[in-house]
């Protein structure tokens, strides 16, 4: 589910470049557990596109597909990726001159927020 942490991350990413492309993982490739995703890819993409900071949205099977389609100059990831992307993502970025940057926004989990709210 789209939440405030996503908005913070996307606003920070927008400040790093001119056009902010956001990739939404398609329903078939979302790895969040049984019964997920809760919302279909079209709904998730529409919600992301509605954010003022987002210029373009694509639905993809994974990061490699997004990189090959967009051909960005910068790949911006959240703090949870600071310990490293998959080796093949890093190699692809190096080979194609794509700078990897990270936002400093805190990692939030929609599932954790929902579970915490249910305890109240």
Language model features by range: what are they?
Residues 1-120:
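Nucleotidyltransferase catalytic core that binds NTPs
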């Amino acid at each position: 589910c789209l939440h405030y942490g996503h908005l913070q991350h996307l606003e920070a990413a927008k400040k790093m470049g001119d056009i902010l492309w956001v990739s939404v993982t398609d329903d078939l490739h979302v790895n969040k557990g049984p019964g997920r995703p809760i919302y279909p890819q079209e709904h998730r993409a529409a919600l992301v596109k509605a954010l003022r900071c987002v210029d373009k949205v694509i639905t993809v099977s994974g990061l490699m597909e997004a990189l090959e389609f967009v051909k960005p100059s910068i790949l911006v990831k959240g703090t949870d990726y600071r310990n490293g992307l998959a080796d093949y993502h890093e190699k692809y970025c190096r080979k194609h001159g794509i700078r990897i940057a990270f936002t400093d926004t805190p990692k939030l989990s929609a599932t954790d927020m929902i579970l915490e709210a249910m305890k109240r």
